[in-house]
From Swiss-Prot:
Annotated function: Basic protein that binds to cell membrane and depolarizes cardiomyocytes. It also shows lytic activities on many other cells, including red blood cells. Interaction with sulfatides in the cell membrane induces pore formation and cell internalization and is responsible for cytotoxicity in cardiomyocytes. It targets the mitochondrial membrane and induces mitochondrial swelling and fragmentation. It binds to the integrin alpha-V/beta-3 (ITGAV/ITGB3) with a moderate affinity and inhibits protein kinases C. It also binds with high affinity to heparin.
GO biological process: killing of cells of another organism
Assembly information from the UniProt record: Monomer in solution; Homodimer and oligomer in the presence of negatively charged lipids forming a pore with a size ranging between 20 and 30 Angstroms.
Record localization: Secreted; Target cell membrane
Protein name in UniProt: Cytotoxin 1
Signal peptide: 1-21
CDD domains, alphabetized: TFP_snake_toxin
Chief localisation class: secreted
Listed SUPFAM superfamilies: Snake toxin-like
Length: 81
């Protein structure tokens, strides 16, 4: 009985992923990656000349400021970029 209970606890821990991990899209939205510790934002980077097609996506710790050439869009939920 103790073995069964221990097995259930281990399976629950593995399935629930007790440490929350953020998943962000890569450049191709079909593919995603799990962000490392400390990188708690997803981002999309656009060139200001064409705001319809992102040129880079991934995980980041702080959302960068926009510049004259580049615009960043950041968010904090799974695959939001």
């Amino acid at each position: 009985m103790k073995t069964l209970l221990l097995t259930l606890v281990v399976v629950t821990i593995v399935c629930l992923d007790l440490g929350y991990t953020l998943k962000c899209n890569k450049l191709i939205p079909i593919a995603s990656k799990t962000c490392p510790a400390g990188k708690n934002l997803c981002y999309k980077m656009f060139m200001m000349s064409d705001l319809t097609i992102p040129v880079k996506r991934g995980c980041i710790d702080v959302c960068p400021k926009n510049s004259l050439l580049v615009k960043y869009v950041c968010c904090n939920t799974d695959r939001c970029n």
